[in-house]
């Protein structure tokens, strides 16, 4: 079969055939080249398939995995959460005083749950202490340990992936000023209102300051800062979303009415 | 290469097909468990933190 296909360079190979004729069919230079190029070709096709599989894994499977882990984290938090699941009073009817500020848990432990109705009626993501890959790649939103806790005067800053591993902040650019962002901790519910966003270079750590981007200024407000990659599917910049604390109610008062259904669902599932 | 592997697998045809499927599945598991998570650090899609705060 191989003999018939070889038409070029037959004079060279016929001269060699005379010298190398042995008990087995002689291995000609063109055979070796064909073998090598076949193996090379198969390896290249394999590499191509592996790369495509990687893209599928990165853009799809990591989300499936992270979603499962985050749902589990939300459920276990909801199970431990004590307090009514229905609002005790209409929103803002009672003033519960200054918000209770919890102490930061250890690395990898759960602070609470974030609800963002703008991101979807079922958007419930865990907030975990720490912002390295071990937290962000599986559990969603990571709290910058150097920043305040929810409700404190100052800056409560969290990071989340724009793409892959749950893509918790994929829709960060869709927030509209006035949108509510709810943070639930063991102490209660903190309602933040989205104020503005900012696109900065990745080294702008000043967005995490107590008063974002203003060094040495004493904070008067409670800010929630969310950071994620920008643009989508890129990382040349960071998109920062700032929200200010609008209200607080203790766990015993029940959830704000807008997220009551989600809070009940999170606990009901557990 | 793959043809050579297939020819050199032991057993009748159906056993060889089964062995191939097991080998492909094993390769997939190894990739998802070890290769892809390792390779993922070279992509930049997951850089969502500011500055060097994420360094352990």
PLM feature spans:
Chain A
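Terminal targeting segments of Actinobacterial cell-envelope proteins
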Residues: 1-37
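Solvent-exposed, non-transmembrane regions of membrane-associated and secreted proteins
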Residues: 32, 38-39, 49-270
């Amino acid at each position: 079969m191989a003999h018939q296909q070889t038409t070029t360079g037959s004079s060279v190979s016929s001269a060699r055939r005379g010298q190398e004729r042995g008990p087995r069919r002689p291995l000609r230079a063109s055979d070796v080249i064909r073998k090598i190029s076949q193996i090379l070709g198969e390896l290249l096709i394999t590499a191509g398939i592996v790369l495509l599989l990687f893209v599928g894994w990165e853009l799809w499977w990591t989300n499936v995995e992270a979603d499962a882990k985050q749902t589990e984290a939300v459920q276990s938090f909801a199970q431990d959460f004590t307090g009514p699941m229905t609002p005790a009073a209409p929103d803002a009817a009672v003033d519960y005083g200054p918000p209770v500020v919890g102490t930061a848990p250890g690395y990898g432990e759960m602070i609470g749950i974030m609800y963002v109705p703008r991101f979807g009626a079922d958007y419930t993501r865990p907030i975990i202490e720490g912002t390295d890959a071990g937290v962000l790649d599986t559990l969603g939103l990571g709290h910058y340990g150097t920043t305040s806790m929810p409700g404190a005067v100052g800056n409560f800053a969290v990071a989340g992936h724009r793409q892959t591993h749950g893509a918790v902040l994929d829709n960060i650019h869709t927030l509209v000023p006035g949108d509510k962002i709810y943070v639930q901790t063991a102490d209660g519910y903190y309602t933040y209102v989205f104020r503005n966003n900012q696109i900065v270079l990745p080294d702008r750590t000043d967005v995490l300051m107590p008063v974002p981007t203003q060094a040495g200024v004493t904070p008067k407000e409670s800010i929630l800062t969310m950071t994620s990659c920008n643009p989508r599917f890129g990382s040349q910049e960071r998109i920062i979303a700032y929200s200010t604390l609008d209200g607080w109610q203790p766990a015993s008062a029940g959830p704000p009415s807008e997220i009551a259904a989600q809070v009940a669902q999170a606990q009901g599932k557990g | 290469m793959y043809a050579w592997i297939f020819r050199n697998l032991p057993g009748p045809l159906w056993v060889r097909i089964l062995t191939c499927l097991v080998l492909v599945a094993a390769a997939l598991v190894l990739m998802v468990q070890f290769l892809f998570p390792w390779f993922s650090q070279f992509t930049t899609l997951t850089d969502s933190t500011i500055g060097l705060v994420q360094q352990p």
